[in-house]
Amino acid sequence: LLHKAIENHVWRQEQCVNLIPSENTPSRAVRLLSGSDPACRYAEHKKILAFYEKEVFYYQGTKFIDQVERMLAEEMRAYFGCTEVETRTLSGQMSNMAVFSALMDWKNRFDRKNEAKRLGYVMNNHIIKGGHLSAQPMGALHDYIAVDPVTEKPAVVNFPVCRDNPYKMDVEETKKLIDRYRPELIIFGKSMVLHKEPVAQIRQFVDEQKIPTTIMYDMAHVLGLIGDHFQNPFQEGAEIVTGSTHKTFFGPQRGVIGVNYKEEDLKYGLWKTIESRTFPGSVSNHHLGTQLGMLMAAYEMNQFRDAYQSAIIRNAKSFARSLKSYGLDVVGDPAIDYTETHQVIVSVGYGEGAEIAERLEQNNVIVNYQATPDEEGFTASGALRMGVSEMTRFGFEEKDFDQLASLMADCILRGREIKAD
């Protein structure tokens, strides 16, 4: 087992070009810390009213972990630019579930005698249009969404997309649907993401129309891009941000929740509910080893944020242009060099994605095949979804992505073996 694990490690870390956009490589420091002593410890804790809202730990030997959690919260608040963060969730999906559970509990806070009412209309990105599973009725939203009495299906309304660009939200049509359905929750965020989400425009609209909704942004794929090179969600009007910490962010595989509520705000009670739906609602042992590694990752991100993020956007746009120049069908808007994120998407023909992804893997290029918005599902996947974040961390620059694009075009279009190159 050790031999095979080391063999696999060397292959992925030293011999492959890793282009899966939901993956990254943590630093050696993050890996080391993630496997240190806290990895086998417990540190359950919560704020107790009888102890004047102080954090009370249920185990001894946790003073170091207490310090780590406080420092991590401080670093993540600085990174997000928000008032409160929860770092105990173990994944983006768990983060979303904690938020959905809290929203449902908050909705029913004045009626504890009757069966809890589920969330009314929720707006999100359709899964075939790039939406993430964790924001779908078939995923994390399943137990918290009401049934539409007209359709007898989950009360979800999907964002409409532009006719000439199915990867981009149609803002004006979205406003019409918001006005019609008056959703309780609006969830931005996608797993197949080429564009910024129109957070500021939708925030302005719901405020003007006095629609009492909560705006949430699931930033799992773009968490490491928060800032001036991409989006500042809280400045634009998001109330809640969730995400996983290992895609564009530098961390081990964990989750995080941030909110921008102040103690004097009515919705600060929702934040307190999010905390309680995290622990004890969602997790007992919150994996102290990777939480320690996450602190180092947060230090790294806050130190190198500007250089990393600018390189990501620059490399993604350059990679997309190069792929197009070598004859591949790059999707998206050419006016913005096809992407505003770390992702680049190439159409390879109906149902051809899996075979071409396997061909590339045989040549040590690792990609992710996906269905396009025009295809009926994953089995018909005709696209390759790629990200530049991991190879940017390994030091790739625009010239390297241009060389890679040329080799990939040879492999995809002409069937040439490129492994030796």
Predicted regions and their residues:
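Conserved PLP-enzyme active-site core in the AAT-like
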Residues: 64-67, 71-329, 388
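N-terminal glycine-rich, Lys/His-bearing helix-loop that initiates the first secondary-structure elements
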Residues: 1-71, 204
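Conserved small-domain helix->loop->beta segment predominantly found in fold-type I
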Residues: 293, 298, 309-361, 366-382
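Short hydrophobic/aromatic beta-strand micro-patches
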Residues: 258, 345-349, 387
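Short acidic (Asp/Glu) and glycine-rich catalytic loops that position anionic groups and cofactors
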Residues: 9-15, 42-46, 51, 183, ...
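A short glycine-threonine-serine/GTX helix/turn-capping micro-motif
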Residues: 19-21, 277-285, 393-395
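PLP-dependent enzyme catalytic core of the Aspartate aminotransferase-like
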Residues: 74, 110, 314, 378-421
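Short, well-ordered beta-strand elements within core beta-sheets of diverse protein domains
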Residues: 19-23, 300, 342-349, 392-394
